[in-house]
């Protein structure tokens, strides 16, 4: 099965019922780089409602997959993010969604 990687960082934003969702797709080659990116984003967006993410990283011949809902209802955020990477056969990438809840909260 063919695998794909990201050539560069991508960003997108979605607004719904007063809430804002900002997504980042970032190429990463090590889990440590995911943690660095998350630390930077948590400092940059300290008032975010949630920072959910999923990653797939092929390191030393082993595929490492992880997802977290970061306080959202179980299975509602992290797993769907991870599934985007899986369905598209993307490795060495993390997708991070930063959410701010408005009137929907």
Place the predicted regions along the sequence by residue:
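Well-ordered alpha/beta subsegment
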Residues: 104-105
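Glycine- and acidic-rich phosphate- and metal-coordinating loops
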Residues: 91-101
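C-terminal regulatory domains involved in ligand/effector binding and gene-expression control
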Residues: 1-76
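Signal for well-folded cores of large energy- and translation-related assemblies
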Residues: 42, 85-90
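Short, charged beta->alpha transition segments
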Residues: 78-86
């Amino acid at each position: 099965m063919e695998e794909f990687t990201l050539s560069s960082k991508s960003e997108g934003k979605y607004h719904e019922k007063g809430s804002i969702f900002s997504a980042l797709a970032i190429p990463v080659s090590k889990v440590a780089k995911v943690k660095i990116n998350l630390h930077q984003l948590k400092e940059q967006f300290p008032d975010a409602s949630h920072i959910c993410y999923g990653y797939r990283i092929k390191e030393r011949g082993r595929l490492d997959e992880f997802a977290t809902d970061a306080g959202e209802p179980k299975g509602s955020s992290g797993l769907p993010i991870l599934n985007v990477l899986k369905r598209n056969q993307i490795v060495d990438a993390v997708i991070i969604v930063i959410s701010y809840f408005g009137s929907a909260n």
